[in-house]
């Protein structure tokens, strides 16, 4: 994955019976990472596509892409979609 000039949504997927708790825990660490790294303009939340799946998403301005990519998101999508 490489940075883009548009805001991007990065996603980390979690599966199984503990997926929701794991995703909530990851979200807390993601928010702490923003503060520690001085990142601004990021938004994040949780989503679920089906039973046994939860994901953390992070909408990132282009200036924060490189820092977020260090966290190895599983997928990404254009924020305009």
Task: Give, region by region, the residue ranges found by the protein language model.
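Short, intrinsically disordered low-complexity segments
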Residues: 38-70
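N-terminal acidic leader/helix
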Residues: 2-36
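Short, low-complexity, intrinsically disordered N-terminal peptides in bacterial proteins
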Residues: 1-6, 77-81
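Short amphipathic alpha-helices in soluble, non-transmembrane regions
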Residues: 26-30, 66-77
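Conserved short beta-strand edge segments in small beta-sheet-based binding/regulatory domains
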Residues: 39-40, 73-81
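Intrinsic-disorder/low-complexity coil detector
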Residues: 2, 6, 60-61, 72
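Short, structured coil/loop segments at alpha-helix boundaries
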Residues: 16-19, 54, 61-64, 79-80
């Amino acid at each position: 994955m490489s940075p883009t000039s548009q805001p991007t949504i990065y996603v980390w997927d979690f599966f199984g019976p503990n997926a929701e708790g794991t995703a909530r825990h990851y979200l807390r660490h993601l928010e702490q990472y923003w503060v520690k790294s001085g990142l601004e303009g990021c938004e994040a939340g949780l989503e679920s596509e089906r039973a046994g799946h939860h994901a953390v998403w992070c909408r990132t301005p282009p200036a924060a892409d490189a820092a977020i990519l260090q966290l190895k998101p599983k997928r990404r999508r254009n924020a305009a979609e």
